[in-house]
Amino acid sequence: SVGFKAGVKEYKLTYYTPEYETKETDILAAFRVTPQPGVPPEEAGAAVAAESSTGTWTTVWTDGLTSLDRYKGRCYHIEPVAGEEDQYIAYVAYPLDLFEEGSVTNMFTSIVGNVFGFKALRALRLEDLRIPISYVKTFQGPPHGIQVERDKLNKYGRPLLGCTIKPKLGLSAKNYGRAVYECLRGGLDFTKDDENVNSQPFMRWRDRFLFCAEAIFKSQAETGEIKGHYLNATAGTCEEMMKRAIFARELGVPIVMHDYLTGGFTANTSLAHYCRDNGLLLHIHRAMHAXIDRQKNHGIHFRVLAKALRMSGGDHIHSGTVVGKLEGERDITLGFVDLLRDDYIEKDRARGIYFTQDWVSLPGVLPVASGGIHVWHMPALTEIFGDDSVLQFGGGTLGHPWGNAPGAVANRVALEACVKXRNEGRDLATEGNEIIREATKWSPELAAACEVWKEITXNFAAVDTLDP
């Protein structure tokens, strides 16, 4: 009947619409749905669409005051996951009007806000989002992007080199600045505050900023290269975060840093706007991501968090190494690395990309490879990530037997050797070790590094794997 009829009704009657043709303004989502036993996949998919858009558990008379057909999310396709029992990919289309312009916060609150605790589902994972051009255009995106960053730094044709200062907690500001200076002096482009360095009793932020700025300017003067240190502006309040970013700008340093998941998307977007307006680069760390993205059947895949960061704004983001100590399977990692860097990315299920994404010239983000990597990984990293990346060696620089500066020299020599060989047409995948060995002949620092790390590998199976 057309009239209002109270009572509970099945979601799929309203929200499962296999005949629906998606619009180019729709936000499309791919969910991995694991229904409770006895719940049909269509009902589970429809429930996800309903609970993340206009639905509630019962019919309400106020539904008659609006056009549900115009505003409801629709589950338009369901496919079983190969090799998994009782797992399905449910595709949901959301009308653009459901979302506030320029707000990643609102987008996530809508799409993943409530539905993950839903009783009819055993587990739920957001695998991918297609952001329509009309929504992309409401975001500023990265403060500067890859090309502008290269122009600011005057560094071309190679990956950039970084190093996280260790021990991450406990150094005084003066000693911390000294470690920064030695790394930059030795040949690195950047050094980095660890993600949990904010403003603690043993080192307050203002002291750290001051000594790091001194290290930057001294090493710049001595090397003739532009240097940077990611000054972590993450703080307990947005106001305090902005205060730190403003102080960094007053010191004249090139780059600040933010933990975008723990700090939150609202704070991150504010900081990104400030950075563009004031010429600061913005380095993004993904602390807390594994709590959200590590389980294969529940949570949010990192490729979605990466897309969200490109919208919210950041010039660098940590994105796994493929070869080090932290998670990252090659094809999947390269899938979201391309989503960060490229302007147009075709749907490619072999790399976990569920939708074609057009960024309409939104600036790109440099992926940062960091975590358990050292000189022997350099050929693989250069091969996998290409020029537009930041390779970050923490222990792989500071663990050098002769100290930080020689550790930095070793990494820079290894990188230059790999880039030179690649440009000469050599195959880094097969000749990588040979290229590094040749370079050790004219770099005692590299030879010493090769000796220390020759045996270390972190061999565990990746958790994040593709479906068969």
Curated annotation (Swiss-Prot):
Where on the chain is N6,N6,N6-trimethyllysine found, per UniProt?
A: 5
Tell me the residues on which N6-carboxylysine occurs: 192
Q: Where is the active site?
A: 166 (proton acceptor), 285 (proton acceptor)
One GO location term (cellular component): chloroplast
Pfam families, alphabetized = RuBisCO_large, RuBisCO_large_N
InterPro entries according to UniProt = RuBisCO, RuBisCo_large_chain_AS, RuBisCO_lsu_C, RuBisCO_lsu_C_sf, RuBisCO_lsu_fd_N, RuBisCO_lsu_N_sf, RuBisCO_lsuI
Q: What is its EC number?
A: 4.1.1.39
Q: Provide the record's note on post-translational modification.
A: The disulfide bond which can form in the large chain dimeric partners within the hexadecamer appears to be associated with oxidative stress and protein turnover.
Location of the protein in the cell = Plastid, Chloroplast
**Is this entry keyworded Kinase?**
no
Which CDD domains does the record cross-reference, listed alphabetically?
Answer: RuBisCO_large_I (cd08212)
The record ties this protein, via Gene3D superfamilies, to: Ribulose bisphosphate carboxylase, large subunit, C-terminal domain, RuBisCO large subunit, N-terminal domain
This entry's comment on the bound cofactor is: Binds 1 Mg(2+) ion per subunit.
Say which family it is in.
Belongs to the RuBisCO large chain family. Type I subfamily.
**Further information:** The basic functional RuBisCO is composed of a large chain homodimer in a 'head-to-tail' conformation. In form I RuBisCO this homodimer is arranged in a barrel-like tetramer with the small subunits forming a tetrameric 'cap' on each end of the 'barrel'.
| Function according to Swiss-Prot or TrEMBL | RuBisCO catalyzes two reactions: the carboxylation of D-ribulose 1,5-bisphosphate, the primary event in carbon dioxide fixation, as well as the oxidative fragmentation of the pentose substrate in the photorespiration process. Both reactions occur simultaneously and in competition at the same active site.
Tell me the NCBIfam families matching this sequence: PRK04208.1 (NF003252)
Query: What is the annotated quaternary arrangement, including any partners?
Result: Heterohexadecamer of 8 large chains and 8 small chains; disulfide-linked. The disulfide link is formed within the large subunit homodimers.
Q: What is the protein name stated in its UniProt record?
A: Ribulose bisphosphate carboxylase large chain
